[in-house]
Amino acid sequence: MPTEPPTDGNTYIIDPESGTEMARLMNQDRLITHGMGGIFPERDDISSMHDILDIACGPGGWVLDVAYAYQKIQVVGIDISRTMVKYAQAQAGSQGLDNATFRVMDALKPLDFSDGSFDLVNTRYIVTFMPKTAWSGLIGECLRVTRPGGTIRLTEAEMPITTS
């Protein structure tokens, strides 16, 4: 159910704390991963990846998938929603995924990580909450926390433009 428009610059119109939204995000995550051809469809060799950040991880589906499939990779998920992070932490704990961690963090603000912390920075479908004016700041933060030679992967839906 839609809530009052946010006043913090966030444009997400659905209550991110609702169980229904959490379930929708988990289903969406599975569909995106499957539709893309897997967790890392663009890579044949991930041996150089040791640390991964997932920005706006929601209930943690992609982080949990990576942590389960690649137990030597440390995966960190961040999200602004404490409810989502608590759920993701509980899932990681119940699955024994010590290589998956989750933190409450606002992607619209400077990220609380050291420079060059990650081999891959991933984010998907953040256009739902990102104001146009915040993109350059987020890209700058992604560049800052990505190691030299690392990858920034932004996945968004193509918005159809039509006059019919």
Task: Give each language-model segment a name.
Residues T151-S164:
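Conserved class I S-adenosyl-L-methionine
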Residues M1-L31:
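N-terminal, positively charged/glycine-rich alpha-helical extensions of SAM-dependent methyltransferases
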Residues S136-T151:
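A short glycine-rich, Lys/Arg-flanked "PGG" loop and its adjoining helix->strand segment in the class I
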Residues N27-D51, D65, A69:
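Conserved alpha-helix/loop element of class I SAM-dependent methyltransferases that forms part
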Residues L111-L120:
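A short acidic, Gly/Pro-enriched loop at the edge of an enzyme's catalytic core
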Residues D51-I55, P59-P110, G137:
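Class I SAM-dependent methyltransferase SAM/SAH-binding core
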Residues D119-A134:
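A short SAM/SAH-binding and catalytic strip from SAM-dependent methyltransferases
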